[in-house]
Design a protein with these regions (language model features):
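A recurrent flexible, glycine/aromatic-enriched loop bordering the glycosyltransferase active site
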Residues: 115-117, 122-148
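Conserved N-terminal segment of class I S-adenosyl-L-methionine
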Residues: 183-264, 268-270, 282-285, 316, ...
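Short beta-strand-to-loop acidic/aromatic patch adjacent to the donor-nucleotide binding site
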Residues: 62-73
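Short, acidic, metal-binding catalytic loop of nucleotide-sugar glycosyltransferases
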Residues: 23-40
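Active-site nucleotide-sugar/metal-binding loop of Leloir-type enzymes
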Residues: 53-64
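Conserved donor NDP-sugar-binding/catalytic core segment of glycosyltransferases
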Residues: 78-111, 304
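A short, conserved alpha-helix in the catalytic core of glycosyltransferases
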Residues: 139-181
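S-adenosyl-L-methionine-dependent methyltransferase catalytic module, highlighting the catalytic core
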Residues: 132, 136, 140-144, 154-157, ...
């Protein structure tokens, strides 16, 4: 029988970024849902700031306490159970493995990548089965998510704050802390990728580049590293992100892409995962065409609405928005290979390079694709493609 536990969850103010605000709510509600669906006996306690143990202990129900300090964390029932089993083996505290973490000891060896909640759960189950009851003692844990024995927490000073628990409990010298190798916890929905895949498509002839929707500047950071001589201008409507991007760009225009007023002739326009967020991407493509010199380039990436994970969810009557990914909450438009090809053609572009980014499907995904294609209802190339990477030339 799984012991009851209390989960302390951070109630933090999200930055003024729509996806992040959604992510904070999504991760909390999804973690609760996944634990409840598995029948776990969990008491949830929200906290603000960095409270002391004296403030939190009276609200704890059960002899196990899971302290979450990062609101962009998704818990799965297999992960919670694996951590509890680790504690049952005599450790005073236990942490999970993550998809992303600051701790090398807690980096998950994923058998396959996941792309949404359903595939995350599938991978979490695979890891829990593969690493059943495996744990390893470590010197320290990533504080994002740690399970403690209540009796150990009660030995700490009541003025000890939640952020101080990890080093303080280690200093008690009353037992070891460990990592539950079968406990996969998802962390993070931040999109700060440097997009090397798009940077690699920039031709040597491009000297003046416009980056639409530059976010916090990951693309510019990478591009300026390999091509420091390039003049790089970004467009970003979110002031928080724009301020971050200014470190890597020669200029950042703070406004919606629909309102940008530029007359310069650029050698290249970069549009990484932007079209799907716009109300009228077809008009924007024509506008971007007008900003390019004759023979100039448009490099873009766009998610594929025909990916197997989306198709499978639709067939099951599901359409679950997520903070980032194929079904990002801020997506307004959807493209397949034929529709993005048509949009570029009508906007005055000729496609020079067309790449299909394909994350290997999970075992259940492979079975779904195989069955759909065998029944004549699916195209394997489309079902296995999660994103299109395109370089087009202005005609």
């Amino acid at each position: 029988m799984i012991p009851s536990l209390t989960i302390l969850w951070p109630n933090l103010s999200a930055p003024a970024i729509e996806e992040t605000r959604f992510s904070y709510k999504f991760c909390h509600s999804m973690s609760k849902q996944l634990c409840e669906e598995a029948g776990l006996r969990v008491s949830w306690v929200n906290y603000s700031g960095d409270p002391t143990l004296g403030e939190m202990l009276p609200g704890i129900d059960g002899d196990r306490v899971l302290v979450v300090t990062d609101p962009e964390t998704v818990l799965s029932a297999p992960a919670v159970i694996a951590m509890i089993m680790c504690i049952e083996n005599g450790f005073i505290a236990c942490g999970p493995v993550y998809n992303h973490t600051i701790s090398p000891d807690q980096t998950a060896a994923l058998p396959v990548s996941y792309v949404d909640i359903e595939t995350y759960l599938e991978v979490a189950e695979m890891i829990a089965e593969r690493e059943e009851n495996r744990h390893s003692a470590v010197e320290s844990l990533d504080p994002a998510c740690v399970l403690y024995r209540l009796d150990c927490l009660e030995q700490l000073p009541i003025e000890c704050r939640l952020s101080e628990i990890p080093p303080s409990i280690t200093n008690l010298n009353i037992g070891e802390v460990a990592v539950a190798k079968g406990a996969l916890v998802h962390y993070g929905f931040k999109n700060d990728f440097e997009r090397e895949d798009l940077v690699e498509l920039v031709p040597e002839s491009a000297k003046r580049i416009l980056d639409i929707g530059c976010a916090i500047g990951g693309y510019g950071k990478r591009l300026k590293t390999v091509r420091p001589e390039i003049f790089l201008m970004g467009v970003e409507q979110n002031p928080v992100m724009a301020q971050s991007a200014e470190r890597y760009y020669d200029d950042v225009v703070r406004c919606p892409v629909e309102e940008v007023n530029l007359t310069d002739n650029f050698d290249l326009v970069n549009c990484g995962d932007i079209l799907e967020h716009l109300r009228d991407p077809w008009s924007i493509l024509k506008r971007l065409n007008s900003l390019l010199r004759h023979g100039g380039y448009l490099i873009l990436s766009v998610p594929n609405a025909g990916h197997w994970s989306v198709v499978r969810d639709l067939l099951k009557g599901r359409f679950r928005y997520v903070p980032a990914g194929l079904l990002c909450v801020t997506h307004l438009r959807w493209f397949t290979e034929s529709s993005i090809r048509n949009a570029l053609e009508e906007a005055g572009f000729s496609i020079e390079t067309f790449q299909r980014k394909q994350i290997p499907p999970t075992p259940r995904g492979q079975a779904f694709i195989r069955n759909m294609c065998a029944a004549g209802y699916g195209d394997e190339k489309s079902l296995t493609t999660n994103e299109f990477i395109i370089r087009a030339v202005k005609r």
